[in-house]
């Protein structure tokens, strides 16, 4: 934590999506959140008022775009516009979770690429830089015409699992789907562990029971994904691993959306512990009993300071948390 950061031109504002994380980030930087109010009229319109001068300042907005996605996105766009009109020197968006990132290509004919549309909206509103965490696909960075820094969560999870002695050849890092192999490989390298994949075949459009590519018999397995929404992907993969002789199953995901029904799905799954970051705020009633939350605040706070002080970001891509 930096105490009383000595630069009055650095200003941090938070909207409604994840104020607890914003407060932690501000504390790690050594400053307080700026004062603003967000109102919603009876017809759903959003109004934002900045309650202090930010003229000539470098402003950082902390806002995830999780559910309600469209409300949180509109809050962000409106505040960007307000800051620009109030003569902020730069408007830097800290987006711990990028909603719509999964719509990054046309999977079917006549589908939109909404991740690109959102990028256009943020830039057009007046954002001058974006800092985000574990994009669904790193190619989304290319949708922007402004600098984008995409931090990774695997070093955070690796640090935690090292503390739990979940390292070495007896540990298998498992991707629950083909598209997540790169993320799983990254964690396996941090933990000196082996790699496996849970795959599924489709016959006549019907998804078949999953099978394992790799050896998990008698091993402790860690499932890795970026987004934990309904929990079904991890739950199904955990069942496949146990059927194939896994000793224990753990899971981690960068963003814990935990939509309705996820708690029951995960508590009924053969998963000993599920780790997520606090990139998305979730209420206690949606958190399964097996949940473990690892804060990304220090990582994002350090990135914010490096941006503000024009320091390189590269050391953060293999961050070793303090106390390692």
UniProtKB/Swiss-Prot annotation:
Q: Sorted alphabetically, which CDD domains does this protein's record hold?
A: PRTases_typeI
* Residues noted as binding D-ribose 5-phosphate in the record, renumbered to the chain: 225, 229-233
Residues at which Mg(2+) binds: 136
Q: Which cofactor does it need?
A: Mg(2+)
Asked whether the UniProt record includes Metal-binding among its keywords, one would answer yes
Would you tell me the Gene Ontology cellular component terms? Answer: cytoplasm; ribose phosphate diphosphokinase complex
Name the domain of life this protein comes from: Bacteria
Please list every transmembrane segment annotated in the UniProt record, as residue ranges: none
Reaction catalyzed: D-ribose 5-phosphate + ATP = 5-phospho-alpha-D-ribose 1-diphosphate + AMP + H(+)
Molecular function (GO) terms for this protein are:
ATP binding; kinase activity; magnesium ion binding; ribose phosphate diphosphokinase activity
Q: What class of enzyme is it?
A: transferase
- What is the first-listed, main subcellular location in coarse terms? cytoplasm
The pathway entry for this protein reads as:
Metabolic intermediate biosynthesis; 5-phospho-alpha-D-ribose 1-diphosphate biosynthesis; 5-phospho-alpha-D-ribose 1-diphosphate from D-ribose 5-phosphate (route I): step 1/1
Q: What are the EC numbers?
A: 2.7.6.1
Q: What InterPro entries would the database entry show?
A: PRib_PP_synth_CS, Pribosyltran_N, PRibTrfase_dom, PRTase-like, Rib-P_diPkinase, Rib-P_diPkinase_bac
Q: Name one Pfam family in it.
A: Pribosyltran_N
Q: Where in the cell is it found?
A: Cytoplasm
Residues annotated as binding ATP: 43-45, 102-103
The record's cofactor note says: Binds 1 Mg(2+) ion per subunit.
Purpose: Involved in the biosynthesis of the central metabolite phospho-alpha-D-ribosyl-1-pyrophosphate (PRPP) via the transfer of pyrophosphoryl group from ATP to 1-hydroxyl of ribose-5-phosphate (Rib-5-P).
The entry's family comment says: Belongs to the ribose-phosphate pyrophosphokinase family. Class I subfamily.
State what protein this is by name: Putative ribose-phosphate pyrophosphokinase 1
The organism is: Enterococcus faecalis (strain ATCC 700802 / V583)
Origin organism lineage: Bacteria, Bacillati, Bacillota, Bacilli, Lactobacillales
